[in-house]
Design a protein with these regions (language model features):
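Extracellular adhesion/carbohydrate-recognition regions
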Residues: 1-48, 91-92, 117
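An exposed tryptophan-centered "aromatic clamp" motif
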Residues: 35-49, 53-109, 118-121
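N-terminal regions immediately upstream of nucleotidyltransferase
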Residues: 111-113
Length: 121
């Protein structure tokens, strides 16, 4: 099923809906930080979370359309490596490159990846 991607001004982000998923990706400027810092930064936030690898891959798959929606509505384009919520052992976590949608392993405490949160609807 091709996802429905639409602008949602109330949540100030891009809403993405498929048969299995329904979430909004934050339109605010992305921050660069380590995975450990990202987890601490959003700890306790009930609404906005780090995305899963699957959610980031879906964003990467439709990045052209998503970036166009963000641009015309005052958001910032999504480019580069973005941290997922998923760990890869004790020292590493997964990030996804928006250029190809592939997941790569980065050191949690030293590698600076972009952070963009999602809210599951």
């Amino acid at each position: 099923m091709k996802p429905t991607i639409k602008w949602n001004a109330d949540l100030y982000g891009v809403e993405i809906q498929t048969k299995d998923q329904h979430f909004v990706i934050d339109a605010n400027p992305s921050m660069v930080m380590t995975w450990n810092d990202a987890v601490r930064y959003f700890e306790g936030n009930a609404e906005w979370k780090l995305p899963t690898i699957e959610q980031l891959r879906l964003v990467a798959q439709y990045i052209g359309k998503i970036n166009m929606l963000l641009r015309v509505n005052g958001g910032y384009e999504i480019r580069g490596f973005f941290w997922s919520s998923e760990e890869n052992g004790k020292l590493f976590a997964w990030d996804v490159f928006m250029g190809d949608g592939e997941a790569y392993s980065g050191r949690k405490n030293t590698f600076g990846g972009y952070v963009r949160t999602v809210s599951v609807l």
